[in-house]
């Protein structure tokens, strides 16, 4: 961790290690500041708990048994300064983000939440921002050249959300 930060990283997102050893969140926050500790949460709709999501780890393959909203709150209480929230159910589909998930997590924590999974166009980013996302991560929409960064930014701006000019 120290090496990564010394190479110029401002933040480090941790998922699997945090689930396996939650005290790591506090250790990182105390050593480097909570602004550096980003809790990465990979969320899947739960088959066990209707209307809820379960946190996964190991690249979305392993069940944690943690309710996502409760895990986000616990992570913040332990020292996480941001949440990187990914909907595994929507990831790569480019059909919109899980707005219910975004609302549930952003209303439960008082730290910035970066949301990912499902962006197919600029309107999806606008919807996520309106649902409470502080920032949006997107990949497939750009990897598969469905839209350019400039087109996304134009759509986002047209939707009334502030975005830095290219």
Per-segment meaning from a language model:
Residues 69, 73-112, 126:
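Internal alpha/beta core interface subdomains
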């Amino acid at each position: 961790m120290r090496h990564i930060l010394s190479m110029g990283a401002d933040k480090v997102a941790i998922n699997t290690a945090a689930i396996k050893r939650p005290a790591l969140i506090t250790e990182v926050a105390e050593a480097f500041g909570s602004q550096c500790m980003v809790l990465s949460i990979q969320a899947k709709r739960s088959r066990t708990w209707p209307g809820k999501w379960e946190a996964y780890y190991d690249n979305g393959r392993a069940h944690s048994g943690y309710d996502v909203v409760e895990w986000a709150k616990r992570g913040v209480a332990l020292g996480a300064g941001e949440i990187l929230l990914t909907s595994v159910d929507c990831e790569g589909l480019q059909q919109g983000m899980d707005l219910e998930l975004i609302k549930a997590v952003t209303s439960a924590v008082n730290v910035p939440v970066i949301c990912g999974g499902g962006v197919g166009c600029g309107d999806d980013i606008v919807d996520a921002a309106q649902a409470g996302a502080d920032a949006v991560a997107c990949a497939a929409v750009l990897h598969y050249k469905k839209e350019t960064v400039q087109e996304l930014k134009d759509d986002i701006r047209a939707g009334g959300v502030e975005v830095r000019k290219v």
